[in-house]
Amino acid sequence: MKKEELQQNMKDRMQQFEDGGLRLLKKGQKGIVHAIFSRFGLVLLLMLLQVGVLWSVFRWFGELLPHYFGGSVAMSAFMVVYILNSEMDNSAKITWMVTIAILPVVGVPLFFYVKSNIGHNALKKRVTRLTEEARGLQPQPLVAAQELAEADLGAASLARYLHGKGGGFSVYRNTEVTYFPSGEAKFEELLRQLEKAEKYIFLEYFIIDEGLMWGRILEVLARKAAEGVDVRVMYDGTCEFTTLPRDYPSRLEKLGIQCRVFSPVQPFVSTHYNYRDHRKILVIDGKVGFTGGVNLADEYINHIEKYGRWKDAAVMLEGEAVRPLTILFLEMWSILREPEFEKFLSVPPHSVPAEGFAAPYGDCPLDGERVGEMVYIDLLNRAKRYIHIMTPYLILDGELETALKFAAERGVDVHLILPHVPDKKFAYALAKTHYKSLLDSGVKISEWLPGFVHAKVFVVDDSEAVVGTINLDYRSLYHHFENAVWMKDTTCIPAIEKDFQKTLEFCRDVEPTRESIWEGKVLLHLAGILLKVIAPLL
């Protein structure tokens, strides 16, 4: 499309927000009523019908068993032995054993359906091939590896894991890392950097929603596309259920912006939909990259209020370590097309003199390697003085809970900040079920009173930190595509710890008593107890 046509499309197809930015949707194209009578309503209805049919089949099958009770007991016993000998997390084993023991005719087929991975085998093969191809594009810079080993053998061992079994991610020097303690701070710098784009802009986000934030960004993207910049946008398919219409990619493409939707939700029951793209990546010309917890919607910059004040965090990378973010984006972009690695990675990485080391990495739920969790556990095991954590959720498996408790029992100051105002009541209830055990081991827990904490931050001993998208829950650690940046001795680490301490000023400290943990909320307490049985399935 010619430059003049793109500019005309900008004028014809967009409406200005009162406070700037651009809009592709008319006001009123959201809300429950719109959702019910949209594709969302149709997909939900068809899925419910399929679930109803499956339930009827299971009940019919149960009625056909001549000796139902004896058969169900034998079936349950066999499955318990099978699950006990599987490689699942212990919490997941308990969940499945309870489900099968109570509802064997439903639980057994459900277990095999979920574990057979029907619906995403093709995706797994494609992602595996792309990941292997990308490994060769990230050779470990020898100087960086040697200098890291000389500085800290423990940190060097983590770098070896990331470059080996962790997915082929290298550790880089010559990268300036800037920390943003809020979505507002990231947004301001992001707009400034977008204006500098000359070759390409890549965006991959879990949530995009029309409003001030996305409108301001979209205005720049459309203008840059008209100038000849290669602009690509990718978002998760759940946006079609919650924020954007199905035809939104075509609306963007009329502005010269390429757009793809990861795993659009179709009206078929499938385990494929369990794997969501929770990453948040923005890359500009291979020189500047952003990541962290901030999605592209107004609540993330406190332009609107959903759950009180919104607390988030992000980082900007300038230099060599932007390369892995470019690769992660191109991997996801290429799932349904031929990869374009060489087109964007043929030139040497952009270098910016800076202190410390940075290693952006991704986590894929289809390769059996829980990279995000392994990095967190390694930091907990190597911490000497303190490890300070901000996370929106706390739904732990046995390994991570043990690592948190063991670090505290070694005398490390383990301190977690969680939200006092939750976005999901069930997640809030589940988090509180872990409080007593952690507190009794010496872990400190504080809840941020002004609202919702969405930041995913680890900072350790004034020397290491992780900022990214990876929550402390089963969905992030087991089922989502995620990403983060591990840092060692970068100049921004003091700013991360300073932000933790400043956030702590507006928190309430939780004591290891029922009154302090549950605050007299009996129903919430009961919900937490019941939900914990099925936590790995949530």
Whereabouts are the PLM-identified features?
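C-terminal structural cap/anchor segments
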Residues: 420-478
